[in-house]
Amino acid sequence: MAAPLTPNAQAYGMLSERTRRRMSDRLRQHGISDERVLSAMHEVPRHLFVDQALATRAYDDVSLPIGHGQTISQPLTVARMTELLIQGRQPGKILEVGTGCGYQTAVLLKTGAEVYSIERLGAILDQARRNLRAAKLVHARLVHGDGNAGLPEAAPFDGIIITAAARAVPAPLVDQLAEGGRMVLPLGDAEQHLWLLEKTAQGLQKTRLDPVKFVPLLGGRG
């Protein structure tokens, strides 16, 4: 649970405009080119999504712990996954599997996506709700549940983003992806890679991309 911001952390937030600009400039240098993604990464105050003790590291390109064995992904990974999901198209309706602290949710909202997000850990989901309220981003539909099962009642989705590493692509999520839709997810156990899946009338087109490291995708609710 993120603690209330101290005066020092609040002051850091007030100065973070320049820091966020440097972060978005770094993302551009690392190949992120979609202006909607760059704008979203600049506009979302990442320091509101981490513990106050880590606020001064919020805009470094590192993953940070958020409690309960979970982490917030490094900014470049968030930007890369978001760009893969929406590049060359309107974001449409997106399912996020693994809400975490809500940062990826916030970035998706800022791109104009209609966001549904599912999280198995109730305590983490409560934290995400608080963080999103603090960032004045309250339009995502947050659900406590098993991400492997997706949200069939809200399907089909134009895009699905999974923020934990699966050993195999969950079949229910493939079923809930619209034809022409994209899914971005890490796959693997000890060795993981980011994958882009595109659903066509002929099936799934799969592209293996960057090596990554994510916490494992688990089933059930906690």
Curated annotation (Swiss-Prot):
Any one Gene Ontology molecular-function term assigned to this protein's record:
protein-L-isoaspartate (D-aspartate) O-methyltransferase activity
Q: What is its EC number?
A: 2.1.1.77
User: Where is this protein chiefly located?
Assistant: cytoplasm
Q: Which GO terms describe its biological process?
A: methylation; protein modification process; protein repair
Active site residues of this protein: S73
Subcellular location(s): the record lists: Cytoplasm
Instruction: Note the InterPro entries from the entry.
Output: PCMT (IPR000682), SAM-dependent_MTases_sf (IPR029063)
> Its catalytic activity?
[protein]-L-isoaspartate + S-adenosyl-L-methionine = [protein]-L-isoaspartate alpha-methyl ester + S-adenosyl-L-homocysteine
| Any one GO cellular component localisation term in the record | cytoplasm
Swiss-Prot/TrEMBL keywords: Cytoplasm, Methyltransferase, S-adenosyl-L-methionine, Transferase
Function as written in the Swiss-Prot or TrEMBL entry: Catalyzes the methyl esterification of L-isoaspartyl residues in peptides and proteins that result from spontaneous decomposition of normal L-aspartyl and L-asparaginyl residues. It plays a role in the repair and/or degradation of damaged proteins.
The family note in this entry says:
Belongs to the methyltransferase superfamily. L-isoaspartyl/D-aspartyl protein methyltransferase family.
Q: Which protein, by its recorded name, is this?
A: Protein-L-isoaspartate O-methyltransferase
Native source organism of the sequence: Chromobacterium violaceum (strain ATCC 12472 / DSM 30191 / JCM 1249 / CCUG 213 / NBRC 12614 / NCIMB 9131 / NCTC 9757 / MK)
